[in-house]
Regions:
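Short, low-complexity, Pro/Ser/Thr/Gly-rich segments in the mature regions of secreted, periplasmic
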Residues: 391-407
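A short local loop/turn or secondary-structure capping micro-motif enriched for an aromatic residue
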Residues: 116-117, 312-316, 402-404
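Preferential activation on post-signal-peptide N-terminal prodomains/segments
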Residues: 1-244
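Hydrophobic/aromatic beta-strand positions that recur at structurally equivalent sites within the blades
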Residues: 98, 108-109, 296-298, 395
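Short, non-transmembrane alpha-helical segments in secretory-pathway proteins
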Residues: 15-22, 29-30, 170-176, 223-268, ...
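C-terminal structural cap/anchor segments
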Residues: 270-351
Length: 407
């Protein structure tokens, strides 16, 4: 019927089954990987029953294989990164591998008579998952991004505040001492006219700034060493945050963090990764108009940058039962002129049909969450609409009115 089912939580078991299938097929002596076109991949996923596991970031395929002891088959050298692993009835004995950011697609093919798609889906009760359709199916056009027809939520505004408001000077000084270690006695403390405090070692080789808006920022001139690779750099980042700020808010309130994005970076001869972490409260992602809760960069196995903008959220206030929200199609239909004007910078009157088609094609993602808006002490329930250009628009969940935007 052209519908899809979306699952964005409790996916660990599905991923483990996928990696097991990848290991088994790659262990066959006559298995091979070939590159296919975007059209071939799209047909296999859209025109047949299929299952796609999408990551929020690309993982180097060689490291993925090494991490999960997946043998390197003929043609594996073609695959640089992977952000999607998929199965389709179009070729039930295949595993499709994609790096969507680079528009690269591959097929790992088994010579055995095996139905990998059935193996991957036999335990899943699809009736319990959210039904979605492509943007093109609902609004017209060829956009194959998925949106739900309707939704409901019990989200309400929640008061938030910067963790520094409840974090004592002693705690922040302890954090500074941990960052500089035995060199802390040689660190200068500088306070500017706005009240921002910077600890500096040497001539700026290391700096740690505590801003009045609650943001903590650490910069470190790293020395040349050996690049760690994706997983080792990620482990370095996780360990650093655990030791310098914890994975909870500094006042002890629990937040659940997740890896939102990862990109390879370089500085001169040094190589590494920058990681962006998002946060969830009450199983809902918290979005910022600007920035993310935690951003950290690793170069040659060393922390070169760390930015922390973690908030505390009050819970236990007024609650409501689940109720209908504005459906995504209606959000787009009511706001396409606003979206078009911002995206194009054209505030003049335009052909409404052309503007609507432009926006419908530009939709990259739309989902519910809580948004931190500038100069608002409440997290607002919202639809978060991301476009292919990287612009993000926030609309009130129950009224579909614009409440903010960002990148």
């Amino acid at each position: 019927d052209g519908s899809y089912r979306l699952k964005d939580s409790d996916t660990t078991e599905t991923l483990e089954e996928c990696l097991l299938a990848l290991r088994e097929i790659s262990g066959e002596s006559d298995a091979s990987i070939t590159e296919i076109t975007a059209e071939q991949y799209g047909e296999a996923i859209r025109e047949y029953r299929s299952l796609a596991i999408n990551f929020a970031y690309a993982i180097p395929y060689r490291e993925l294989c090494a991490r999960w002891e997946i043998p390197r088959v003929q043609g594996a050298e073609l695959v640089i990164g992977a952000d999607t692993l998929a199965f389709s009835q179009a070729s039930a004995q295949s595993i499709f591998i994609a790096e969507r950011r680079e528009n690269k697609y591959y097929r790992l093919y088994s010579q055995r008579d095996v139905d990998l798609f059935s193996v991957m889906t036999e335990q899943e009760d699809l009736s319990k998952l959210t039904a979605c359709y492509t943007v093109g199916t609902i609004l017209g056009g060829e956009n194959d991004r998925l949106i739900p027809l309707s939704a409901e939520s019990n989200l309400v505004p929640l008061r938030w505040y910067e963790e520094s408001e409840e974090t004592s000077q002693d705690v922040r000084r302890t954090l500074a001492e941990a960052l500089f270690g035995e060199n802390f006695d040689f660190v200068r403390r500088i306070t500017d006219t706005f009240g921002n405090v910077t600890y500096m070692y040497g001539y700026g080789q290391k700096t740690f700034t505590q801003r009045v808006d609650g943001v903590l920022e650490y910069k470190n001139e790293t020395s040349e060493g050996a690049a760690g690779g994706f997983f080792r750099d990620l482990e370095t980042a996780l360990s650093f945050v655990s030791a310098h700020g914890t994975w909870d808010s500094l006042d002890g309130r629990e937040l659940r963090f997740f890896l939102r994005d990862a990109r390879a970076v370089s500085a001169g001869k040094q190589e590494g990764y920058r990681f962006w972490f998002g946060a969830k409260m009450l199983d809902q992602t918290i979005y910022y108009e600007s920035g993310v809760p935690i951003e950290i960069e690793v170069l040659d196995g060393q922390i070169s940058y760390y930015r922390r903008d973690v908030i505390s959220v009050e819970t236990g206030g007024e609650t409501y039962g689940f109720r209908p929200v504005q459906d995504p199609a209606n959000v787009i239909a009511r706001n396409y002129n606003h979206i078009y004007n911002v995206m194009t910078g054209n505030m003049l009157a335009v052909n409404e049909e052309s503007a609507f088609e432009y926006v419908a094609q530009a939709v990259e993602d739309i989902r519910m969450g809580l948004v931190r808006i500038a100069n608002d002490d409440r997290l607002r329930p919202a639809w978060i609409l991301a476009t292919e250009s990287g612009q993000v628009f926030y609309f009130s969940l129950y009224e579909a009115t614009p409440i903010g935007m960002g990148k």
